[in-house]
Amino acid sequence: MSAAPVQDKDTLSNAERAKNVNGLLQVLMDINTLNGGSSDTADKIRIHAKNFEAALFAKSSSKKEYMDSMNEKVAVMRNTYNTRKNAVTAAAANNNIKPVEQHHINNLKNSGNSANNMNVNMNLNPQMFLNQQAQARQQVAQQLRNQQQQQQQQQQQQRRQLTPQQQQLVNQMKVAPIPKQLLQRIPNIPPNINTWQQVTALAQQKLLTPQDMEAAKEVYKIHQQLLFKARLQQQQAQAQAQANNNNNGLPQNGNINNNINIPQQQQMQPPNSSANNNPLQQQSSQNTVPNVLNQINQIFSPEEQRSLLQEAIETCKNFEKTQLGSTMTEPVKQSFIRKYINQKALRKIQALRDVKNNNNANNNGSNLQRAQNVPMNIIQQQQQQNTNNNDTIATSATPNAAAFSQQQNASSKLYQMQQQQQAQAQAQAQAQAQAQAQAQAQAAQAAQAQAQAQAQAQAQAQAQAQAQAQAQAQAQAQAQAHAQHQPSQQPQQAQQQPNPLHGLTPTAKDVEVIKQLSLDASKTNLRLTDVTNSLSNEEKEKIKMKLKQGQKLFVQVSNFAPQVYIITKNENFLKEVFQLRIFVKEILEKCAEGIFVVKLDTVDRLIIKYQKYWESMRIQILRRQAILRQQQQMANNNGNPGTTSTGNNNNIATQQNMQQSLQQMQHLQQLKMQQQQQQQQQQQQQQQQQQQQQQQHIYPSSTPGVANYSAMANAPGNNIPYMNHKNTSSMDFLNSMENTPKVPVSAAATPSLNKTINGKVNGRTKSNTIPVTSIPSTNKKLSISNAASQQPTPRSASNTAKSTPNTNPSPLKTQTKNGTPNPNNMKTVQSPMGAQPSYNSAIIENAFRKEELLLKDLEIRKLEISSRFKHRQEIFKDSPMDLFMSTLGDCLGIKDEEMLTSCTIPKAVVDHINGSGKRKPTKAAQRARDQDSIDISIKDNKLVMKSKFNKSNRSYSIALSNVAAIFKGIGGNFKDLSTLVHSSSPSTSSNMDVGNPRKRKASVLEISPQDSIASVLSPDSNIMSDSKKIKVDSPDDPFMTKSGATTSEKQEVTNEAPFLTSGTSSEQFNVWDWNNWTSAT
């Protein structure tokens, strides 16, 4: 791009600017002389003149503007000086007094003294005269400054004081696209610039020449006039339409009831008569909403009117926000507020009429039918009114894609039919009793107010579906009316359909969570890149079209997401929706300005994601609807079983459609679950076969014991608890959670189970295992045998089989001998209470909820321990003593703040850890720190590491017996570290057989720990799983050691002793002498 053009004001020479300063200074000095100023004031005036000229030069954009402003300022001040000088001269000529004295006397006229009294005072007290003269000069100077400030303020106010309409026009001019015919009149404009906001940015960057600026000003005026004329015509058209609506209003209160009572025959019209008309035709048809704004003072009190107006303004603002950045014009806002207040007035009139009709129904039984029809007509009118109003106001949204439109129409149709049926049932219930009618009227009003707030953002998405649903319901009602020969004797009893969103009253916690998630989403920092230049015109048009089609989908997902959260309590889903809402809003705003920040494929993925969101939300709403319908049917069957069949006659078609859709969904879900179960069973069978083959290959001697145990488990009189049937041949029923009996929650935490889990487990016994979540585990690969609770070792299997069985019945008597149960047979399993009910997998999973949380916490604890040790190795790499002591402190449960270090941590390391250095961490380092499971810091030369998940109660201590086990065998007169190293060598182990050093007895293998459950949780507990892959006593066996160690090997082992350099020094090193340890560091 070329360099910025040189401003013509820069061509002014210093001599010309000095000439302007002298001209301004001459006028100021004349005024100072007229005011009787001193030399000090003259010096200040010179400084002010220079500063004023410099400020004016910097403010001016051209030489012409600079010279005009300077000449105008000098001319104004010269005129002021001449006027004052003439006035002083005229007064002095009349009174024969010097001009300066006459000016001072005029300034002192407010004190009530005349010219003669002034002369007397001057003769009597010269000092007082001098004081008055000085005061007069100060007053004149102050007046001059005040006048200048007032002139500047008036100019600023003239620029700033704009009416709301002018301000709105200015704002509209900033974002309104400039017509191409006008844009061509401005030379040197880049092709991507089409708004005045962008032109202003170019001018501020000094990329436009003065000729361009002059042309831009002329074009701006023309464009402003065009917009003003267009707005004026729009206002006139709206005012004329409003006048027509006012002419259709009610002149008297008595006519309100006549206009509200529309005959039922007019409402039961064919669907095409109302669905194909536009909003203006609907307003002029039989569904015209009565206007009662001229009687607002008779309906509401002044306080109610003020509160209602404020409520209407807030509702209008909320509606404007839901349009994702689209601005509403002032006439549309006023029309919205008027219609909102009109609806409120109609609702109040309706409530009063309902109470009156209920009173008449109680006094006269013949008015029952009329009392039932009137509220239905009013409700239907209000529903039609909401449709017309929303169609008139929100016309910016467009239809969505065809694939999503069918789904949305079906969902909206079901939702609207439920609302209408609920309103009909409430209207019929109101005619029974006055108290009950008032309560239901209030509930209906609250429900309608909530529905209105939602319908304002969803009006266009449901307008067509509402009209179709109303016509369909009216046609059904008309058919039922013809089918009933005696409607008075057999009154219609409509069954109230459950509203899927009814009763979703959010708790205080829900409201707080939703607010917090919305606030967090609003703080999201979006870094969008302008890709406008990389897109073709065809791609731009496609992006605009798809965003316009998906706008309705975006609004619906954003509006229904909080309500679905109340059902599912899924915070991640709501958070994603809020974040995407901010993302979509930014995209739409940029697109409205002609800037594209996403490509076409990104828009496609975004719409697909929103469609998936909506489909998921629709399924949740339908599920809740099915639950509410079942609850209602159960309540109707329990409360009035004789009227169930008659109540269902009104909603047969609706229920059939809903049941068919739900049955299809359930059938698909069952098929998916069955396929998953079959796949899981096949995988489990394959795993079992592989494990059995490995078991027979590795431990052939253990097969008889397992077979005996399997036969014992299948014996009819044997009593083995449900949780203990986990042998090799009867394992599958645990994996198919649907067909198993319900496990009580208390069974997972019984003392007997904990005791059996902590028991010894023979490592050679091979059995299929599943994770036992009640055991604290720190290793993902750790799995404890399911037969650990009651399963004996292979040596005692026969003895156990001979033991006397318990007489209590086993819950798995019907299990087949091969251990793989048939699903059909599992359904016939009898419980102690009779027939065994079917349980789903959710109930079984809830039984292990406590253990799952514990296992998760232990897994996090393991990660924290590993991370703590890694940080210690990094920081204490030059201090083994601190590394050892801090690790030992963790084992003893000592807090980090109480641990002292022997070395001083370098300041560079402290700044790096605490992030207090001048050098900021890189993105990779910050990402690693965020993903770390602990927060690390160094305070007062102490390494403090706190858990991110449990900062206060986290402890890494272990039992003292386990700490003592490390030093097992060390005692007596032990002083030499080499003794510890040699004694711990596997070559000198007492477990080795002297006769055959390469072979060992099975009893001394000690693959499974025997002492405590803590050793099971140690990192070495995966030896058992590793031993499955190798043979015992093979070269890869970790427990197998060569018979003799060479001298070099012994020397290498000896050198492993810390702080030992030679054999002589090892004899002198006393482990109990602290000085030796400190000197070694």
Curated annotation (Swiss-Prot):
- Give UniProt keywords alphabetically: Acetylation, Activator, Nucleus, Phosphoprotein, Repeat, Transcription, Transcription regulation
Q: Bias category Polar residues: which stretches? A: 749-836
A Gene Ontology term for the protein's cellular component? core mediator complex
Organism superkingdom? Eukaryota
Q: Where is this region: Interaction with GCN4?
A: 25-49
Identify residues that carry N-acetylserine: S2
Which of the residues bear the PTM Phosphoserine?
S335, S736, S752, S783, S785, S789, S831, S1003, S1008, S1018, S1034
Q: Give the residue ranges for region: 30 X 2 AA approximate tandem repeats of Q-A.
A: 422-481
- Plastid as UniProt keyword: no
Tell me, what is an example of a GO biological process annotation in this record? positive regulation of transcription initiation by RNA polymerase II
Knockout mutant characteristics: Sensitive to amino acid starvation. Normal GCN4 protein level during amino acid starvation.
Q: Where are the sequence repeats?
A: 422-423, 424-425, 426-427, 428-429, 430-431, 432-433, 434-435, 436-437, 438-439, 440-441, 442-443, 444-445, 446-447, 448-449, 450-451, 452-453, 454-455, 456-457, 458-459, 460-461, 462-463, 464-465, 466-467, 468-469, 470-471, 472-473, 474-475, 476-477, 478-479, 480-481
Q: What is its main location?
A: nucleus
InterPro entries assigned: Gal11_coact (IPR033789), KIX_dom_sf (IPR036529), MED15_KIX (IPR036546), Mediator_Med15_fun (IPR008626)
Amino acid composition bias (Low complexity), ranges on this chain: 476-497
Write out the annotated subcellular location: Nucleus
Q: Where is this region: Disordered?
A: 238-286, 476-505, 692-712, 744-836, 1026-1055
| GO molecular function (one) | TFIIH-class transcription factor complex binding
Q: Name one Pfam family in it.
A: Med15_fungi
Q: Which cysteines are joined by disulfide bonds?
A: none
Q: How does it assemble?
A: Component of the Mediator complex, which is composed of at least 21 subunits that form three structurally distinct submodules. The Mediator head module contains MED6, MED8, MED11, SRB4/MED17, SRB5/MED18, ROX3/MED19, SRB2/MED20 and SRB6/MED22, the middle module contains MED1, MED4, NUT1/MED5, MED7, CSE2/MED9, NUT2/MED10, SRB7/MED21 and SOH1/MED31, and the tail module contains MED2, PGD1/MED3, RGR1/MED14, GAL11/MED15 and SIN4/MED16. The head and the middle modules interact directly with RNA polymerase II, whereas the elongated tail module interacts with gene-specific regulatory proteins.
What is known about what this protein does? Component of the Mediator complex, a coactivator involved in the regulated transcription of nearly all RNA polymerase II-dependent genes. Mediator functions as a bridge to convey information from gene-specific regulatory proteins to the basal RNA polymerase II transcription machinery. The Mediator complex, having a compact conformation in its free form, is recruited to promoters by direct interactions with regulatory proteins and serves for the assembly of a functional pre-initiation complex with RNA polymerase II and the general transcription factors.
Q: What else is known?
A: Present with 606 molecules/cell in log phase SD medium.
* The protein's name: Mediator of RNA polymerase II transcription subunit 15
**Which lineage?**
Eukaryota, Fungi, Dikarya, Ascomycota, Saccharomycotina
